[in-house]
Amino acid sequence: MSKWRKKQLQEIAFLRPTETLKKGDIAPNIPMANIKEFQRDVVKIDYSEFRGGTKFRNGDTLLAKITPCLENGKTAFVNCLQEDEIGFGSTEFIVLRAKENIDERFLYYLSISPEFRKQAISLMEGTSGRKRVNENALKISDFLIPDFEEQRKIANILSAIDDKIQINNQINQELEAMAKTLYDYWFVQFDFPDQNGKPYKSSGGKMVYHPELKREIPEGWGVESVGNLLDKVTKAEKIENNLIEFIGEIPVIDQSQKYIAGFTNNENGLIQPQKGHVIFGDHTRVVKYINFDYARGADGTQVLISKNEHIFKE
Protein backbone atom coordinates (compact mmCIF):
# COMPACT_ATOMS: atom_id res chain seq x y z
CA MET A 1 0.00 0.00 0.00
CA SER A 2 1.32 3.44 -0.95
CA LYS A 3 1.80 6.23 1.52
CA TRP A 4 -1.19 8.55 1.66
CA ARG A 5 -0.25 12.24 1.58
CA LYS A 6 -2.21 15.21 2.83
CA LYS A 7 -3.10 17.60 0.02
CA GLN A 8 -5.36 20.59 -0.38
CA LEU A 9 -8.34 20.12 -2.67
CA GLN A 10 -7.02 22.80 -5.02
CA GLU A 11 -3.83 20.74 -5.46
CA ILE A 12 -5.74 17.75 -6.84
CA ALA A 13 -8.71 19.37 -8.58
CA PHE A 14 -9.75 22.41 -10.57
CA LEU A 15 -12.82 24.02 -9.04
CA ARG A 16 -15.16 25.47 -11.69
CA PRO A 17 -12.79 24.81 -14.63
CA THR A 18 -13.06 27.21 -17.56
CA GLU A 19 -15.16 26.09 -20.53
CA THR A 20 -16.76 28.03 -23.36
CA LEU A 21 -20.44 28.07 -24.26
CA LYS A 22 -22.06 30.93 -26.12
CA LYS A 23 -25.32 32.32 -24.84
CA GLY A 24 -28.11 31.08 -27.05
CA ASP A 25 -26.35 27.81 -27.92
CA ILE A 26 -28.38 24.64 -27.49
CA ALA A 27 -26.38 22.40 -25.18
CA PRO A 28 -26.78 19.49 -22.75
CA ASN A 29 -28.30 20.70 -19.50
CA ILE A 30 -28.19 18.85 -16.17
CA PRO A 31 -30.44 20.58 -13.61
CA MET A 32 -30.25 19.71 -9.92
CA ALA A 33 -33.40 17.58 -10.26
CA ASN A 34 -31.56 15.21 -12.62
CA ILE A 35 -29.12 14.19 -9.90
CA LYS A 36 -30.30 11.64 -7.37
CA GLU A 37 -29.05 11.28 -3.81
CA PHE A 38 -25.93 9.11 -3.51
CA GLN A 39 -26.20 7.96 -7.12
CA ARG A 40 -23.15 8.18 -9.35
CA ASP A 41 -24.81 8.50 -12.74
CA VAL A 42 -26.90 11.42 -13.97
CA VAL A 43 -30.55 10.40 -14.39
CA LYS A 44 -31.04 12.14 -17.74
CA ILE A 45 -29.84 15.02 -19.90
CA ASP A 46 -32.02 17.86 -21.13
CA TYR A 47 -31.08 19.96 -24.15
CA SER A 48 -31.88 23.64 -23.81
CA GLU A 49 -30.65 27.14 -24.59
CA PHE A 50 -27.59 28.19 -22.60
CA ARG A 51 -28.16 31.41 -20.69
CA GLY A 52 -25.74 30.84 -17.84
CA GLY A 53 -24.66 28.35 -15.20
CA THR A 54 -21.77 26.05 -14.43
CA LYS A 55 -20.07 24.30 -17.36
CA PHE A 56 -18.54 20.83 -17.44
CA ARG A 57 -17.53 17.85 -19.56
CA ASN A 58 -17.22 14.08 -19.15
CA GLY A 59 -15.00 13.11 -16.23
CA ASP A 60 -16.04 16.06 -14.06
CA THR A 61 -17.79 15.73 -10.71
CA LEU A 62 -20.88 17.81 -9.93
CA LEU A 63 -21.17 18.60 -6.23
CA ALA A 64 -24.28 20.35 -4.92
CA LYS A 65 -23.22 23.25 -2.71
CA ILE A 66 -26.59 24.39 -1.34
CA THR A 67 -28.66 23.04 1.54
CA PRO A 68 -30.35 20.55 1.68
CA CYS A 69 -29.01 19.14 -1.61
CA LEU A 70 -25.45 18.71 -0.31
CA GLU A 71 -26.57 17.11 2.95
CA ASN A 72 -28.88 14.78 1.01
CA GLY A 73 -26.00 13.51 -1.14
CA LYS A 74 -26.60 15.13 -4.54
CA THR A 75 -23.23 14.47 -6.17
CA ALA A 76 -22.70 12.93 -9.61
CA PHE A 77 -19.95 11.83 -12.00
CA VAL A 78 -20.47 13.16 -15.53
CA ASN A 79 -20.14 10.35 -18.09
CA CYS A 80 -23.21 10.95 -20.24
CA LEU A 81 -22.00 13.56 -22.74
CA GLN A 82 -20.61 13.06 -26.22
CA GLU A 83 -16.84 13.26 -26.74
CA ASP A 84 -15.64 16.86 -26.33
CA GLU A 85 -19.23 17.98 -25.63
CA ILE A 86 -19.71 20.76 -23.07
CA GLY A 87 -22.72 20.68 -20.79
CA PHE A 88 -24.10 23.20 -18.33
CA GLY A 89 -26.12 23.07 -15.15
CA SER A 90 -27.23 24.78 -11.99
CA THR A 91 -25.17 27.59 -10.51
CA GLU A 92 -25.57 25.63 -7.26
CA PHE A 93 -23.04 23.03 -8.49
CA ILE A 94 -19.36 23.05 -7.66
CA VAL A 95 -17.59 21.46 -10.63
CA LEU A 96 -14.50 19.40 -9.75
CA ARG A 97 -12.03 18.35 -12.46
CA ALA A 98 -9.10 16.07 -11.70
CA LYS A 99 -5.61 17.50 -12.10
CA GLU A 100 -2.58 15.57 -13.36
CA ASN A 101 -1.90 12.28 -11.54
CA ILE A 102 -5.40 12.24 -10.06
CA ASP A 103 -7.89 9.61 -11.21
CA GLU A 104 -11.14 11.40 -12.10
CA ARG A 105 -13.25 8.56 -10.69
CA PHE A 106 -11.25 8.59 -7.45
CA LEU A 107 -11.98 12.31 -7.18
CA TYR A 108 -15.70 11.56 -7.42
CA TYR A 109 -15.51 8.89 -4.71
CA LEU A 110 -13.48 11.24 -2.54
CA SER A 111 -16.24 13.85 -2.90
CA ILE A 112 -18.88 11.46 -1.55
CA SER A 113 -16.71 10.13 1.27
CA PRO A 114 -17.81 10.87 4.86
CA GLU A 115 -14.66 12.93 5.51
CA PHE A 116 -15.18 15.16 2.46
CA ARG A 117 -18.91 15.60 3.04
CA LYS A 118 -18.42 16.41 6.72
CA GLN A 119 -15.84 19.06 5.83
CA ALA A 120 -17.96 20.58 3.05
CA ILE A 121 -21.07 20.72 5.24
CA SER A 122 -19.08 22.37 8.05
CA LEU A 123 -18.12 25.15 5.61
CA MET A 124 -21.69 26.11 4.73
CA GLU A 125 -22.60 29.76 5.26
CA GLY A 126 -25.71 31.91 4.95
CA THR A 127 -29.22 32.09 6.32
CA SER A 128 -31.11 28.99 7.38
CA GLY A 129 -32.52 27.12 4.40
CA ARG A 130 -30.21 28.89 1.89
CA LYS A 131 -26.78 27.92 3.16
CA ARG A 132 -24.00 27.34 0.63
CA VAL A 133 -20.49 25.92 0.83
CA ASN A 134 -17.71 28.50 1.06
CA GLU A 135 -15.72 27.38 -1.99
CA ASN A 136 -12.62 29.37 -1.05
CA ALA A 137 -12.46 27.56 2.27
CA LEU A 138 -13.21 24.19 0.68
CA LYS A 139 -10.41 24.43 -1.88
CA ILE A 140 -7.77 24.84 0.84
CA SER A 141 -9.15 21.94 2.90
CA ASP A 142 -6.78 18.99 3.37
CA PHE A 143 -7.52 15.40 2.34
CA LEU A 144 -5.41 12.24 2.36
CA ILE A 145 -4.55 11.09 -1.17
CA PRO A 146 -2.72 7.88 -2.28
CA ASP A 147 -0.52 7.61 -5.37
CA PHE A 148 -2.14 7.38 -8.80
CA GLU A 149 -1.95 3.60 -9.10
CA GLU A 150 -3.74 3.05 -5.80
CA GLN A 151 -6.30 5.72 -6.70
CA ARG A 152 -7.08 3.74 -9.85
CA LYS A 153 -7.41 0.46 -7.95
CA ILE A 154 -9.79 2.04 -5.43
CA ALA A 155 -11.83 3.64 -8.21
CA ASN A 156 -12.02 0.34 -10.13
CA ILE A 157 -13.44 -1.50 -7.11
CA LEU A 158 -15.97 1.20 -6.23
CA SER A 159 -16.99 1.64 -9.88
CA ALA A 160 -17.64 -2.10 -10.18
CA ILE A 161 -19.89 -1.91 -7.10
CA ASP A 162 -21.76 1.08 -8.55
CA ASP A 163 -22.20 -0.78 -11.85
CA LYS A 164 -23.72 -3.69 -9.95
CA ILE A 165 -26.02 -1.33 -8.04
CA GLN A 166 -27.19 0.18 -11.32
CA ILE A 167 -27.99 -3.26 -12.74
CA ASN A 168 -29.88 -4.20 -9.57
CA ASN A 169 -31.86 -0.96 -9.75
CA GLN A 170 -32.87 -1.76 -13.32
CA ILE A 171 -33.95 -5.25 -12.25
CA ASN A 172 -35.96 -3.75 -9.38
CA GLN A 173 -37.69 -1.35 -11.77
CA GLU A 174 -38.69 -4.25 -14.02
CA LEU A 175 -39.95 -6.26 -11.04
CA GLU A 176 -41.91 -3.25 -9.79
CA ALA A 177 -43.54 -2.88 -13.22
CA MET A 178 -44.49 -6.57 -13.11
CA ALA A 179 -45.94 -6.15 -9.61
CA LYS A 180 -48.06 -3.19 -10.76
CA THR A 181 -49.36 -5.24 -13.69
CA LEU A 182 -50.20 -8.13 -11.36
CA TYR A 183 -52.01 -5.75 -9.00
CA ASP A 184 -54.02 -4.37 -11.91
CA TYR A 185 -55.10 -7.87 -12.97
CA TRP A 186 -56.12 -8.85 -9.44
CA PHE A 187 -57.62 -5.72 -7.90
CA VAL A 188 -58.68 -3.52 -10.82
CA GLN A 189 -59.70 -5.93 -13.56
CA PHE A 190 -60.49 -8.74 -11.05
CA ASP A 191 -58.93 -11.28 -13.40
CA PHE A 192 -57.08 -13.25 -10.74
CA PRO A 193 -56.97 -17.02 -11.40
CA ASP A 194 -60.19 -18.81 -10.47
CA GLN A 195 -60.35 -22.40 -9.20
CA ASN A 196 -59.74 -23.60 -12.75
CA GLY A 197 -56.80 -21.29 -13.32
CA LYS A 198 -58.79 -19.00 -15.62
CA PRO A 199 -59.18 -15.20 -15.24
CA TYR A 200 -62.06 -14.72 -12.81
CA LYS A 201 -64.11 -11.84 -14.25
CA SER A 202 -63.35 -12.52 -17.94
CA SER A 203 -64.44 -16.13 -17.45
CA GLY A 204 -67.82 -15.18 -16.01
CA GLY A 205 -66.97 -15.04 -12.31
CA LYS A 206 -69.87 -13.65 -10.31
CA MET A 207 -69.68 -9.94 -9.48
CA VAL A 208 -71.84 -8.09 -6.94
CA TYR A 209 -72.44 -4.37 -6.59
CA HIS A 210 -70.95 -2.71 -3.50
CA PRO A 211 -72.76 0.54 -2.57
CA GLU A 212 -69.85 1.97 -0.56
CA LEU A 213 -67.41 1.56 -3.43
CA LYS A 214 -70.10 2.24 -6.03
CA ARG A 215 -68.79 -0.53 -8.22
CA GLU A 216 -68.94 -4.28 -8.65
CA ILE A 217 -66.53 -6.54 -6.81
CA PRO A 218 -66.08 -10.33 -6.85
CA GLU A 219 -68.64 -12.26 -4.84
CA GLY A 220 -67.34 -13.01 -1.36
CA TRP A 221 -65.03 -10.00 -1.26
CA GLY A 222 -65.53 -7.36 1.41
CA VAL A 223 -64.44 -3.84 2.29
CA GLU A 224 -62.41 -2.95 5.36
CA SER A 225 -60.86 0.26 6.69
CA VAL A 226 -57.07 0.38 6.44
CA GLY A 227 -56.97 1.46 10.07
CA ASN A 228 -58.56 -1.85 11.08
CA LEU A 229 -55.92 -3.83 9.21
CA LEU A 230 -52.66 -2.00 9.79
CA ASP A 231 -50.90 -0.28 12.66
CA LYS A 232 -47.88 2.03 12.77
CA VAL A 233 -44.65 1.50 14.66
CA THR A 234 -43.87 4.66 16.62
CA LYS A 235 -40.96 3.46 18.75
CA ALA A 236 -37.29 4.25 17.98
CA GLU A 237 -35.65 7.55 17.20
CA LYS A 238 -35.97 8.90 13.65
CA ILE A 239 -32.83 9.83 11.71
CA GLU A 240 -32.86 13.33 10.21
CA ASN A 241 -31.63 13.73 6.62
CA ASN A 242 -28.58 15.76 7.60
CA LEU A 243 -27.49 13.00 10.01
CA ILE A 244 -27.59 10.19 7.43
CA GLU A 245 -24.05 9.05 6.61
CA PHE A 246 -22.54 7.40 3.54
CA ILE A 247 -20.98 4.68 5.72
CA GLY A 248 -22.23 3.26 9.02
CA GLU A 249 -23.44 0.21 10.93
CA ILE A 250 -27.21 0.60 10.52
CA PRO A 251 -28.94 1.15 7.15
CA VAL A 252 -31.43 4.02 7.11
CA ILE A 253 -34.72 3.49 5.30
CA ASP A 254 -36.73 6.56 4.34
CA GLN A 255 -39.53 7.38 1.92
CA SER A 256 -37.29 8.19 -1.06
CA GLN A 257 -37.12 6.06 -4.20
CA LYS A 258 -33.71 4.80 -3.12
CA TYR A 259 -34.03 1.51 -1.22
CA ILE A 260 -31.41 2.45 1.39
CA ALA A 261 -30.97 6.18 2.00
CA GLY A 262 -27.65 5.83 3.81
CA PHE A 263 -26.38 4.73 7.20
CA THR A 264 -26.21 5.71 10.85
CA ASN A 265 -24.45 4.54 14.00
CA ASN A 266 -27.25 5.82 16.25
CA GLU A 267 -28.44 2.70 18.08
CA ASN A 268 -31.41 4.63 19.53
CA GLY A 269 -32.90 4.49 16.04
CA LEU A 270 -32.48 0.72 15.61
CA ILE A 271 -35.61 -1.22 14.61
CA GLN A 272 -35.44 -5.03 14.53
CA PRO A 273 -38.36 -6.65 12.68
CA GLN A 274 -39.09 -10.29 13.48
CA LYS A 275 -39.86 -11.14 9.86
CA GLY A 276 -40.47 -7.91 7.95
CA HIS A 277 -41.89 -4.40 7.96
CA VAL A 278 -43.67 -2.40 5.28
CA ILE A 279 -42.29 1.13 4.89
CA PHE A 280 -44.68 3.71 3.48
CA GLY A 281 -43.87 7.31 2.53
CA ASP A 282 -46.82 9.52 3.40
CA HIS A 283 -45.49 12.21 1.01
CA THR A 284 -43.98 10.11 -1.80
CA ARG A 285 -46.28 7.06 -1.48
CA VAL A 286 -43.20 4.88 -1.99
CA VAL A 287 -43.63 1.40 -0.46
CA LYS A 288 -40.75 -0.85 0.63
CA TYR A 289 -40.54 -4.23 2.33
CA ILE A 290 -37.72 -4.47 4.90
CA ASN A 291 -36.69 -7.75 6.51
CA PHE A 292 -33.44 -6.71 8.19
CA ASP A 293 -32.40 -4.46 11.08
CA TYR A 294 -32.64 -0.78 10.14
CA ALA A 295 -33.27 2.77 11.31
CA ARG A 296 -36.14 4.92 10.09
CA GLY A 297 -35.70 8.23 8.29
CA ALA A 298 -37.60 11.30 9.41
CA ASP A 299 -40.21 13.40 7.58
CA GLY A 300 -43.08 11.10 6.77
CA THR A 301 -41.49 7.65 6.84
CA GLN A 302 -44.13 5.32 8.30
CA VAL A 303 -43.57 1.73 9.47
CA LEU A 304 -46.67 -0.43 8.97
CA ILE A 305 -47.44 -3.76 10.65
CA SER A 306 -50.51 -5.99 10.56
CA LYS A 307 -53.06 -6.07 13.36
CA ASN A 308 -55.45 -8.42 11.57
CA GLU A 309 -55.22 -12.21 11.81
CA HIS A 310 -55.88 -12.59 8.08
CA ILE A 311 -52.93 -10.43 7.04
CA PHE A 312 -49.31 -11.52 7.23
CA LYS A 313 -47.65 -10.33 10.41
CA GLU A 314 -43.99 -9.67 11.12
Protein language model regions, located:
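Non-catalytic DNA-recognition/assembly elements of restriction-modification systems
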Residues: M1-T20, L144, F148-K153, S159-Y185, ...
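A short glycine-rich beta-alpha junction/loop motif
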Residues: S2, E85-I94, E125-A155, Y294-Q302
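Short beta-strand/loop turn elements enriched in aromatics
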Residues: F14-K36
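Short, basic/aromatic beta-hairpin or loop at an interaction surface
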Residues: P28-V43, D84-G87, P251-D254
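Short alpha-helix capping/helix-loop boundary micro-motifs
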Residues: D41-R51
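Short, solvent-exposed loop/turn positions at domain surfaces
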Residues: E49-F50, T127, N266
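A short beta-sheet element
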Residues: G53-T54, N58-S113, K258-E314
